[in-house]
Amino acid sequence: MDYTVEEKEAFMREALKEAEIALENDEIPIGCVIVKDGEIIGRGHNAREELQQAVMHAEIMAIENANASEESWRLLDCTLFVTIEPCVMCSGAIGLARIPKVVYGAKNQKFGAAGSLYDILTDERLNHRVEVETGILEDECAGIMQDFFRNRRKK
């Protein structure tokens, strides 16, 4: 499903709410929502410190929630909105879940796997390719990360 700019911004604001939850828990503030037919079916935020699990990234949590909601591992006809460009692990999970579209706010120059450092989501050698859109609420998404790391360096 294609969404208007206003709808995309609204869903990204929901992802930013998830990032705020991560921030409150002293986690790297990344948030994610998965949308199907205009409804959020999965939410997630970074929870590695809280759960002491290296793989608990926002996208993984949102995919698990959406899988439970849909009672299926296939998330066809869904769009994943995430505040920061997915990493290699999350890009792999997105492909394995058969999510057809990812919208992310800000680039991840150090770990990005959706065009910045690597380009896993659109790699033609893989059996599932994902449409990628960037820049929705980019300043807000980048800002929460920049503030987090600026404050962390002061500690």
Predicted segments — roles?
Residues M1-N25, W73, P86-K155:
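Zinc-dependent deaminase
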Residues A15, A19-A22, C32, G42, ...:
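Small-residue (primarily alanine) positions within well-ordered alpha-helices
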Residues I28-I30, C78:
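Short loop/turn microsegments at loop-to-beta-strand junctions
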Residues I30-G38:
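Short beta-strand scaffold segments in enzyme catalytic cores
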Residues K36-D37, E64, L76:
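A cytosolic small-molecule/anion-sensing beta-strand core signal
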Residues I41-R48:
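Short beta->alpha transition motifs characteristic of CBS
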Residues E50-I60:
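A short, polar/charged loop-to-alpha-helix boundary motif
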Residues S72-I84:
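Immediate flanking context of iron-sulfur cluster ligation sites
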